[in-house]
Regions:
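Helix-biased detector of long, well-ordered alpha-helical tracts
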Residues: 1-207
Length: 207
């Protein structure tokens, strides 16, 4: 559940009510292990395109524009999958600031890095078509945040359980990379195995 950061700006008074409690079973974001597989729920990038469309910084057809704007204003939260995480996740975080930035937070202060495979990162059919038609840079589009999907790592032996959880909940769960040993070794690869860079690492908090 989100605590703060849920309202960027508004011309109306807004109140948020939250409740807090204690749990003996918590999945921390900094417990990833070397050789863990990296997974993410849902699709990435739609919300960012919605934001770009609202500021007229993206060339999108009107009917597609409505789709992306809707994803920005009303993200589909994968709440049903969260109750299964304890069965397989070693670490977990929500993708709010951007895939690469949030993944970096998961391995912060650990002697770990990540390998990401661009072609494995899930996007919607509409975004996929837009990337092909306009020759857009996929890794930059999916790195800007506001996706609110679940990013987690798990032992390779948990693959079958994860697949079952995806089928049970109806929520797409995709393996997108791997945790590797050693600091400062994080890499992103395209479909040909060539190393690529992301211009945008995500949203940077200024406080």
């Amino acid at each position: 559940y989100l605590c703060g950061g849920d309202t960027t700006f508004s011309n109306k008074l807004s109140f948020t009510i939250i409740s807090m409690g204690y749990s003996n079973k918590i999945i921390y974001r900094n417990k990833a292990k070397s050789n863990d597989d990296i997974y993410v729920t849902g699709n990435l990038g739609d919300s960012y395109l919605g934001l770009k469309a609202l500021s007229n910084k993206a060339k999108i057809r009107n009917k597609d524009k409505l789709f992306f704007v809707d994803k920005y204003y009303k993200p589909e939260l994968p709440l049903n999958v969260t109750k299964y995480l304890l069965k397989f996740a070693n670490s977990s975080i929500d993708v709010s600031d951007g895939l690469i930035d949030d993944l970096a937070k998961m391995i912060n202060r650990q002697s770990l890095s990540f390998h990401l495979f661009e072609n494995k990162i899930p996007v919607s059919n509409k975004l996929s078509n837009l990337i092909k038609k306009q020759r857009l840079n996929k890794i930059n589009l999916i790195s800007n945040g506001d996706d609110y999907q679940v990013l987690f790592t798990a032992d390779i032996k948990k693959a079958r359980i994860i697949k079952k959880a995806s089928k049970t909940t109806g929520i797409k769960i995709t393996k997108i990379g791997k945790i590797v040993s050693g600091k400062d070794r994080s890499l992103i690869f395209d479909e040909k195995g060539k190393q690529i860079r992301a211009k945008s690492k995500g949203y940077i908090h200024r406080f």
